[in-house]
């Protein structure tokens, strides 16, 4: 493909080799987006396929991070990412107060 894609694929492979990472999102386990092709060499047990629900995905991403794993959350439909902002603004930033 191109240099950008090659570097993105190389970065995803490196992240996939790290013991504390996890990939989640739409089309991470199954073909569907260009990002799927960057995950071909990532171990399958590190991939968590998500339904189309950006806010839920961000909430799960926050929980995974709080539990100590490094989440790599893929949002192929970036124009719907604004739906996930609630989880960041109204939940993650108040985590200390809730704990």
Identify the residue ranges that each predicted region occupies:
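Thiamine diphosphate
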Residues: 1-99
